[in-house]
Swiss-Prot record:
This is Large ribosomal subunit protein bL33. PROSITE patterns: RIBOSOMAL_L33. GO terms for molecular function: structural constituent of ribosome. InterPro entries: Ribosomal_bL33, Ribosomal_bL33_CS, Ribosomal_bL33_sf, Ribosomal_zn-bd. It comes from Borrelia turicatae (strain 91E135).
Length: 59
């Protein structure tokens, strides 16, 4: 059983570090519940500290 490739409410997004620009994390987001872009404080392994990560598209 494969996943459907339609336009569902849940989408896969990447979290991009604001200081380095590297995509460190991937997560899912429900578009019906959250319309604005996701912003989280996450650990950046390059800088070895917690930085702001914003939602970006997965290539």
């Amino acid at each position: 059983m494969g996943k459907k490739k339609g336009k569902g409410a849940v989408e896969l997004i990447a979290l991009v570090c604001e200081e380095t620009g590297i995509r460190n994390y991937t997560t899912t987001k429900n578009r019906r519940n959250k319309q604005e872009k996701l912003e989280l404080m996450k650990y950046c392994p390059i800088l070895r500290k917690h930085t702001l990560h914003k939602e970006g598209k997965i290539k």
